[in-house]
Design a protein with these regions (language model features):
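Bacterial Sec-dependent N-terminal signal peptides
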Residues: 1-47
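Extracellular, repeat-based ectodomains that mediate carbohydrate processing or recognition
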Residues: 46-361
């Protein structure tokens, strides 16, 4: 028996969204990775195609969680992938975009694949070095980079800044203009954590701390964020607050943006933040009470005018059914709209990884 999970890869002009799908067999500890490739143009759309990659671990969602940034990276005419195999080893792969043949490398590193939090995040810098961070759920920073540009050989683990790297969860890389990289992670625990931000300079070939505490949970809560860097280089950041380890304490949707690679932050109306951002000075894109089945860690984007769009779901007070929503700013004010018509109720309760009946958008 096979379960199918697929995500399209679309390319439209200069915009690219890339991810991968999997086919899972319930009686085996691994699954086949596949790519679904598709190109959308103004003239015609092509049918997607499947590209088999290899066997990956499947007893948890560690290879498929939505907060991996990124597990699939394209630079020039080459594409890179990362995943855990059936034995928990970190595997890297690359291929030419016009080829279905992957070159795979089982690295020297393993992860605790039984915990779906312990994802792999990777990114290529402007010189072609591959940067990876992996296997975190309140652990010391695990970070390494390739030994040479465009190779699958990884060097030893190393520190980035050697400051506040002992309790890391949700590592994420983002490309910046000029080939530099942004790296964010949570320092602390669920309900008691802060958002930390680093910047990698290709010129200096080193990491620098941008924000020791960008979003401060004040030892009372933490932010579960989603981040997007638009074509102009503006960093868009949105998040929900969580008061405790329990998912039902998720509440509200907040927003901030930066035009200078994370140094200075603003609200959507242009007002400058006094950092760090806390509960009392955050901009609230939408007020959503606790116990609303509000999901954390979803997706966001921005239009060509730099206006943010956030995809999420929650339940209205007079309903038992969570609905998908789009929350956006039009340059003047915030809006939100229900974009689904679901009929099946469910509840988000308790701590840990949940078996959720609908996907994070």
């Amino acid at each position: 028996m096979w379960d199918h999970v697929f995500i399209d890869i679309w390319q439209k002009d200069t915009f690219k969204f890339q991810s991968f799908g999997a086919v899972h067999r319930a009686d085996h500890n691994s699954f086949f990775f596949f790519l679904i490739l598709s190109t959308l143009t103004t003239l015609r759309a092509q049918q997607p195609r499947l590209v088999e990659v290899g066997n990956g671990y499947s007893q948890t969602s560690v290879n498929t969680t939505v907060f991996r940034n990124n597990s699939l990276v394209t630079q020039g005419d080459e594409q890179y992938i990362s995943y855990y195999d059936g034995d928990g080893y970190l595997v890297l792969g690359k291929r030419k975009l016009d080829s279905d043949q992957w070159t795979l490398k089982r690295t020297q590193y393993k992860g605790n694949v039984k915990d779906a939090h312990n994802i792999i995040s990777m990114m290529l810098d402007g010189e072609g070095y591959l940067h990876l961070s992996f296997d975190h759920h309140g652990h010391k920073l695990n970070y390494c980079r390739s030994t040479a540009p465009y190779t699958l050989e990884l060097g030893d683990k190393e520190s980035m800044t050697d400051v506040d790297e002992g309790n890391v969860t949700y590592p994420e890389f983002y490309p910046l203009n000029g080939g530099d990289l942004l790296f964010v992670y949570r320092s602390g625990s669920s309900g008691r954590g802060n958002l930390v931000m680093n910047h990698y300079s290709v010129k200096e070939k080193k990491w620098n701390r941008v924000q020791d505490v960008l979003i401060d949970g004040e030892d009372q809560r933490n932010a579960y964020w989603q981040l997007y860097v638009d074509e102009q280089g503006t960093i868009h950041l949105s998040w929900v607050w969580r008061e405790t380890w329990y998912v039902e304490t998720n509440h509200d949707l907040c927003y901030a943006r930066s035009y200078d690679n994370g140094v200075t932050w603003y609200k959507a109306n242009g007002k400058k933040y006094d950092l760090p951002i806390r509960y009392n000075n955050a901009e609230y894109a939408c007020r959503i009470p606790q116990n609303s089945e509000l999901i954390n860690q979803t997706s966001m984007s921005a239009d060509t005018s730099g206006n943010p769009y956030i995809a999420t779901y929650w339940r209205d007070p007079d309903s038992e059914v969570p609905q998908y929503r789009i929350v956006w700013h039009d340059g003047q004010m915030w809006h939100n709209r229900q974009v689904s018509n679901r009929h099946t109720p469910f509840s988000l309760k308790g701590g840990g990884t949940k078996m959720i009946p609908i996907a994070r958008p």
